[in-house]
């Protein structure tokens, strides 16, 4: 059964979700079988802290599934931060492909999988991946602002894939896909998703 709680900011949606968590606990559902997932690490932490203020006998270890989906995948896959593509890796790819990249990184502090870059090539490639369409399909949607060369776009995507394969690295989208492929999903009886409208298709 699936329910949606809809409302503008500040109307108590998170409080409502936490009240529902408490109802399941009162009915006998174990906390390690309840998942509460938020779009950002900050939002997940705030929800966890608010719940712990109510349930003072509990600790963070008791509600380990209050997190982002990327944190869940990262932990279940046993990854380390050095396994994940970083800003420097994308800059090196840019040097190989002849494009200047000042910054290109995921918001690792939030672990929400949001990718930002000053290169519209990289942004377009990442957008296509989270939408689960090809980069050329995304290009043909004409949602980009700058001029994008079709052949260069294809070459950059191939270089990213080759680079990751050569150095054994993954990005945040790979992380979710690998998690799904390995099917190492914790046995949860109920799942809450805060700000579900912000999730990508693959999430």
Report each predicted region and the residues it spans.
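Catalytic P-loop NTPase motifs of RecA-like helicase/translocase cores
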Residues: 12, 73, 193-202
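Accessory N-terminal region flanking or inserted into the helicase ATPase core
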Residues: 1-7, 16, 33, 106-192, ...
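Conserved phosphoryl-transfer catalytic core
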Residues: 84-111
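P-loop NTPase Walker
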Residues: 1-83
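Short beta->alpha junction loops/turns
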Residues: 10, 40, 180, 196-197
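Hydrophobic, Leu/Ile/Phe/Ala-enriched alpha-helical segments that form helix-helix packing faces
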Residues: 24, 51, 55, 97, ...
